[in-house]
């Protein structure tokens, strides 16, 4: 029987878990690290799952229909996922994003036919959100999916990402770590894993330069995709057991090490997540345990950033 897909929506989800054995050997780790390569989704990131879920939900409710305009504030990846699906379904897409986001992300959005509205970088995601809300009032038949507040975000991970990790590890997962942007990934995966194994440790990773979860204060940082500067509505703050603060340099170093030891090129937030997994793998009490880190996207969206230029 031929295995041919009609379009790419059916390809979203089920990227593999990979054990970076060379990296583990290089660092002398005695815990097992498994990385989930979410950049293998059709539009290149974990946010494909969220974009699909939010658009599907809006269509089913009759909110999104022919002639509708999708407007969304994004740091890049959700916008790319939405732009990809909007192109396939014939919707107009307008994305607002901080001007500090990489040139590559902007160019990808343009390639999908989306319109980009850049906002002041110092205002972070709050500025992008405010601009999206302003545009929605001006443009008829517009719809803001609202990744920071839309329950479809965490639901997508609770119904897909979490079960995939559980199945692929045969339930052998002790620690799960993911960066917090909207909080949807950590919430959905964390809730599912704890429903199966209550003592799974869920670790929320945030930028050390913007410790909103741990210290209640935001700030500028270089880890694109996480650390929005506020606590998102989507985030279940009771689901994580610990918070790991990743600094810019260790995230960059981990991403570079993964490329040089495994031939896997990942993005900035992926490097940060990996750095957290490495830190936990080095702890004596975690010897023999399995640590799963979710890597949101690939390095090809960051060639113009310090990840590759420094």
Walk through the language-model features, giving the residues of each.
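PLP-dependent amino-acid enzyme catalytic core
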Residues: 1-310
């Amino acid at each position: 029987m031929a295995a041919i897909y009609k379009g790419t929506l059916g390809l979203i989800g089920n990227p593999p878990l990979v054990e970076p054995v060379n990296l583990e050997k290089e660092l002398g780790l005695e815990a097992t690290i498994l990385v989930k390569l979410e950049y293998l989704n059709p539009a290149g990131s974990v946010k494909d799952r969220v974009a699909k879920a939010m658009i599907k939900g809006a269509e089913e409710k009759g909110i999104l229909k022919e002639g509708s305009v999708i407007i969304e504030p994004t740091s890049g990846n959700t916008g790319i996922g939405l732009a990809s699906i909007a192109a396939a379904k014939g919707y107009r897409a307008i994305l607002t994003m901080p001007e500090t986001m990489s040139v590559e992300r902007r160019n990808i959005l343009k390639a999908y036919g989306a319109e980009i509205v850049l906002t002041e970088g110092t205002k972070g995601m709050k500025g992008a959100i405010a601009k999206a809300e302003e545009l929605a009032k001006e443009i008829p038949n517009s719809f803001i999916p609202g990744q920071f507040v839309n329950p479809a975000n965490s639901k997508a991970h609770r119904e897909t990402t979490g079960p995939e990790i559980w199945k692929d590890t045969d339930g052998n997962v002790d620690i799960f770590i993911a960066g917090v942007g909207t909080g949807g990934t950590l919430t959905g995966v964390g809730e599912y894993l704890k429903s199966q194994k209550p003592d799974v440790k869920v670790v929320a990773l945030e930028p050390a330069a913007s410790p909103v979860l741990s210290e209640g204060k935001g700030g500028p940082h270089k880890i694109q995709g996480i650390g929005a500067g506020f606590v998102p509505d989507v985030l279940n703050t009771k689901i994580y057991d610990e918070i790991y603060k990743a600094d810019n340099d260790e995230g960059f170093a981990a991403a570079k090490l993964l490329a040089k030891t495994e031939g896997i090129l990942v993005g900035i937030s992926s490097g940060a997540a990996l750095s957290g997994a490495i830190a936990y793998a080095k702890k004596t009490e975690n010897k023999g345990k399995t640590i799963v880190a979710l890597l949101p996207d690939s390095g090809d969206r960051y060639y113009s950033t310090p990840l590759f230029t420094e």
